[in-house]
Amino acid sequence: MTQTQLKSPHPARDWPFQVIPLHPVLGCEIIGITLAQAVSPAIFAKVYEAFLDYQLILFRDVDLPPTTQVAFAHNFGEVQIHVLSQYHGYKEHPEIYTLSNLDKDGNPSGKHSDKGTLYWHTDGSWRERSGQATMMYSEIVPEVGGETEFADMYSAYDLLPPTIKSKIDGRRAIHNFDFSRTRRHGEDPLTAEQKAKVPPIAHPIVRTHPDTGRKAIFLGDHAEWIEGMDYEGGRALIEELNLMITPPARVYTHSWNPRECMV
């Protein structure tokens, strides 16, 4: 796909909006409708089709107060509440997880509020029921940095060598939030009560999406070890896979502007 094609609107099937691809592999911007229109059942059904096709959908220049954000998120299904309650930025809306490097006085702290998010991960893979999507909204963005990267896990599986596929098909990885936050990155944001709520959980390394029927890799930084393998061997395979499935050519890097909503 050429740069001209990436920047040109696509007429997009029978959708009541147009899409602009963000990257040759994944992601699109939706134009021609507002978020208020997108939540109507008839239009949202088409928005969801775009989400399934492109894996990422972006709305630019939108007002998204907490109440509206939670309401829009409910269109995708049950909205989960993050176990790290210290990041719940709105008392009335615990569904919203807030990340900021500003202190209580609004000044840059010089610290990243959640360093674990700097590594490749699948949001909420440490849950027994992992979510199908994450909704992000930008309020204040830095002049430099702060990008978010997304990798295509469909093609990650499709392009794996047959020898690697045979190693992982049918296997499960143990995802452990305490491992990824405490032992792996040297931070300990979880209280004892929070740790008890998120014990290690097993998920298939290769999952089939129920709506698209496509196979995808389900790994990332929260995956600690692999059932049926010795610990060190499983760790080595996870590290190898995490490198193989995130090559630059299949990664979209999003540079944020204020008032953007990404799902």
List the predicted regions and their residue ranges.
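Non-heme Fe(II) oxygenase catalytic core, chiefly the N-lobe of the double-stranded beta-helix
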Residues: 2-261
